[in-house]
Amino acid sequence: MSDSIIELKNISVHFQNGSESIDAVKNINLAIEKGEIFGIVGYSGAGKSSLVRLINLLHHPSSGDMMIGQTKTVKNGNVLIKGKELRNLRQKIGMIFQHFNLLDQSTVLGNVLFALKHSKMSKEKRLEKAKKLVEEVGLFDRIDNHPSQLSGGQKQRVAIARALANDPEILISDEATSALDPKTTKQILELLADLNKRTGLTIVLITHEMQVVKNIANRVAVMRDGEIIEKNSTYSIFADPQKPLTKEFIESASGNQEALEKILRQPEIARLQKNEFLIQLGFSGSSTDEPLISSLAKNYGVSANILYGNVETIENIPIGTLIVVLSGTATKLKQALDEIKKQNVKLEIIKEGK
């Protein structure tokens, strides 16, 4: 990838815990482009935090190569930089976490200034920069408040301002919204997306919540047991997931599975009659604009009872789901199902009446 800011080749991390051998990261190949928002999704223990701590060498790899920008940082598992060069690298990589790690006795401004204490700027310039950062994250009216006077979302905004103090090229967000309520999470993600758009900041999102990457990520990697099992554009991941775990994550973010489970508990679905099919249709892109259900009724004489529908937009492309009961004669139903299969629509037969 020609414009990669992070590139990992055959990277592994191996720990020895007494007699126990742990492979935290296994043979990872990953390139993250400059200026993109890249999501890494996985359950606890998947290895995503171990992977991301390699980027600023808080963890050392056991094998593989790594490039950060134009700097070769690891070759054949050996770290090539140390001392001042390593400190300079880490200054270019900001991090925010689930826990805000603010200085309780310092104000909002003081917390941001703390990140600039080793800067070569004059005191006046540091103060000017800190105030600008506080304003950028929308907290200028809280600049003299202490952390105890702030909400969780406001504390995370301070943490973001502090992480940006040394003009990083990369911002790593490690479960930074997992302790926040949905409304505050949305606001923090909007702030990160705005920073990315305005400054070109590369953002790496580590999360166990697919909803987080769905909202702002350009691309996604799914991890399990230290390995990346699937990676693609966010749209492609949601429109056509390949792995069962990826599908599980997507279902948790869409509400489709919950809706289907409720439908299956309905008495009329439990008593589905012969020549009735409960089906789920998946639409993406231009297929969401097609009047498929009405054309099936018109052209094949089947009736369609829509039980659930959902459309959301991923990367400005619509993705939709319908759960429908189709009924008609056996011949007409077969023709209708065959027609669906010819379209750019995913068909899953959930239940067939008897």
Curated annotation (Swiss-Prot):
Keywords: Amino-acid transport, ATP-binding, Cell membrane, Membrane, Nucleotide-binding, Translocase, Transport. Pfam families: ABC_tran, NIL. It is an enzyme of class 7 (translocase). Its EC number is 7.4.2.11. Coiled coil: none annotated. Gene3D superfamilies: 3.30.70.260, P-loop containing nucleotide triphosphate hydrolases. Residues 6-250 form the ABC transporter domain. The keyword S-adenosyl-L-methionine does not apply. It is a peripheral membrane protein. SMART domains: AAA, NIL. GO terms for cellular component: plasma membrane. ATP binds at residues 42-49. GO terms for molecular function: ABC-type D-methionine transporter activity; ATP binding; ATP hydrolysis activity. The complex is composed of two ATP-binding proteins (MetN), two transmembrane proteins (MetI) and a solute-binding protein (MetQ). Belongs to the ABC transporter superfamily. Methionine importer (TC 3.A.1.24) family. This is Methionine import ATP-binding protein MetN 2. It comes from Oenococcus oeni (strain ATCC BAA-331 / PSU-1). The gene is metN2.
